[in-house]
Amino acid sequence: MNKKNGPSLGHNKKSLLKSEVEHIDITSFDSRKIIESMKKMSFTSRDTAKAAEIYNEMINDKDCAIFLTIAGSTSAAGCMNLYSDLVKYNMVDAIVATGASIIDMDFFESLGFKHYQGNQFQDDKVLRENYIDRIYDTYIDEEQLQACDKTCLLYTSDAADD
């Protein structure tokens, strides 16, 4: 670990891309007790408990359609399986996401590529020299991202020809 408790700063691609981001499995634990205990706390803890209560009401209301909107890099940060589980277990009815979330994160990983734990303090010059892109403290292999883009281009080119 280095300053600011991040993964150690490396200087070559192999050392920079050594720790894969692991996606959370919401089926592996029960968070209800800790969230319920947050009702008696302050700040965002209490807000989280209140949000959970509202969400439970929404789930139990058969006339309520729940849309999950995703912007930002939460898929790359380890929430990818969370979204599919929310659909699988009827906890959301629809997902609306940005192109970056769908292509550069979800589709990217469906091709077998990974996101890696990084460090927000890593020198951008070192990253660029190693063809690594940074999403805050997450790394992505630029060459793999280009392969993802080329794959998308193949599909969209075929669709445009139809």
List each model region and its residues.
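Conserved small/polar residues in nucleotide/adenosyl-binding loops
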Residues: 155-160
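Metallocofactor- and cofactor-centric catalytic cores in central/energy metabolism, strongly enriched
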Residues: 2-137
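Active-site- or DNA-interface-adjacent structural scaffold in DNA-acting proteins
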Residues: 139-149
